[in-house]
């Protein structure tokens, strides 16, 4: 097995401005910036407050115009591609939840939820429970921030502090999850931050805890070592240097990811384990929603992934 090193350790943990936690701030900032556009693809009225509560450095990332990039046209182009990608990804999974709600599923589990605000911003049918699993400090930050601003969930909202590398199903059941009921699962922006064997174990545990008719939506990427060589990582770090200097941040997202040439293809794994999968390349979904981007640009910045949804019992999605 070939792999490129990660700065992560087997038992690492983090708060919202640290390590993987900081990536949740970056994603929420992109949603806030999209929401502030004249014709936004998605609206997340909670994104800005969740980002700005982390401090002014983060808040300036969450506005419509990336003024902090100055006149650097290339940096602005990259920023726009990233914002568009995050908007399209969010839209795809919002549609997924709308579909599963109409299908009658009333139990939702968001894995590594970060600063996801769907429990508060989507219109859930009566009787829906949204469970969110993430690191304790991340969930503490989110719930405290939302409570301080009087945010009211539109479903029964249950944060579950747990590490996805531990026995998280036990924590989920203890919080009220019923594995006998169909569940809608979400793994968005998660898989690159799991070792290959942990990804397999995650899917196995999801399957064990999924009743017939359950659904799952996943964002997957090509995490082979060839894509994340030290040379390519250095090139990507150099491209993002102005952003880090302007924002006074020292975060190397690539170094937080796990790469290995034996990582299972998510769609193939799910198909082989009884799930009926429908998948779309991110470039195709971006084009469909009017936010096209060159595939070479998406590949260079790790956004040439696959968005997929699957149903356990093999019926049409």
Curated annotation (Swiss-Prot):
<feature type="binding site">
    <location>
        <position position="134"/>
    </location>
    <ligand>
        <name>S-adenosyl-L-methionine</name>
    </ligand>
</feature>
<dbReference type="GO" id="GO:0008168">
    <property type="term" value="F:methyltransferase activity"/>
</dbReference>
<keyword id="KW-0949">S-adenosyl-L-methionine</keyword>
<dbReference type="InterPro" id="IPR011610">
    <property type="entry name" value="SAM_mthyl_Trfase_ML2640-like"/>
</dbReference>
<feature type="binding site">
    <location>
        <begin position="163"/>
        <end position="164"/>
    </location>
    <ligand>
        <name>S-adenosyl-L-methionine</name>
    </ligand>
</feature>
<protein>
    <recommendedName>
        <fullName>Putative S-adenosyl-L-methionine-dependent methyltransferase MSMEG_0093</fullName>
        <ecNumber>2.1.1.-</ecNumber>
    </recommendedName>
</protein>
<comment type="similarity">
    <text>Belongs to the UPF0677 family.</text>
</comment>
<dbReference type="InterPro" id="IPR007213">
    <property type="entry name" value="Ppm1/Ppm2/Tcmp"/>
</dbReference>
<dbReference type="Pfam" id="PF04072">
    <property type="entry name" value="LCM"/>
</dbReference>
<comment type="function">
    <text>Exhibits S-adenosyl-L-methionine-dependent methyltransferase activity.</text>
</comment>
<dbReference type="InterPro" id="IPR029063">
    <property type="entry name" value="SAM-dependent_MTases_sf"/>
</dbReference>
<keyword id="KW-0489">Methyltransferase</keyword>
<keyword id="KW-0808">Transferase</keyword>
<dbReference type="GO" id="GO:0032259">
    <property type="term" value="P:methylation"/>
</dbReference>
């Amino acid at each position: 097995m070939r792999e490129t090193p990660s700065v992560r350790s087997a038992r690492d943990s983090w708060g919202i401005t640290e390590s993987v936690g900081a990536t949740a701030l970056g994603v929420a900032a992109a949603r806030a910036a999209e929401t502030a556009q004249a014709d936004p693809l998605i609206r997340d009225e909670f994104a800005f407050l969740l980002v700005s509560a982390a401090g002014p450095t983060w808040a300036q990332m969450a506005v419509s115009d990336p003024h902090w990039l100055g006149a650097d046209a290339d940096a602005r182009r990259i920023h726009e591609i990233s914002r568009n990608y995050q908007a399209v990804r969010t839209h795809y999974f919002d549609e997924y939840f709308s579909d599963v709600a109409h299908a009658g599923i009333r139990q939702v589990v968001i894995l590594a939820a970060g600063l996801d605000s769907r429990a508060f911003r989507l219109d859930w049918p009566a009787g829906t429970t949204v469970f969110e699993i993430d690191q304790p400090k991340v969930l503490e930050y989110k719930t405290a921030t939302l409570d301080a601003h009087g945010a009211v969930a539109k479903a029964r909202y249950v944060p579950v502090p747990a590490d996805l590398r531990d026995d998280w199903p036990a924590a989920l059941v203890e919080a009220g999850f019923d594995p006998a009921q169909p569940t809608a699962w979400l793994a968005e922006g998660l898989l690159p931050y799991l070792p290959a064997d942990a990804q397999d174990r995650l899917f196995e545990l999801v399957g064990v805890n999924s009743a017939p008719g359950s659904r799952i939506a996943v964002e997957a990427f090509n995490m082979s070592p060839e894509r994340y060589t030290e040379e390519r990582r250095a090139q990507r770090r150099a491209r993002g240097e102005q952003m880090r200097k302007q924002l006074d941040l020292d975060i190397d997202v690539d170094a937080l990811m796990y790469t290995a040439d034996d990582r299972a293809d998510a769609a193939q794994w799910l198909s082989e384990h009884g799930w009926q999968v429908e998948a779309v390349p991110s470039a195709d979904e971006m084009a469909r929603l009017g936010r096209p981007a060159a595939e070479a640009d998406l590949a260079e910045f790790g956004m040439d992934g696959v968005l997929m949804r699957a149903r356990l019992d093999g019926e049409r999605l």
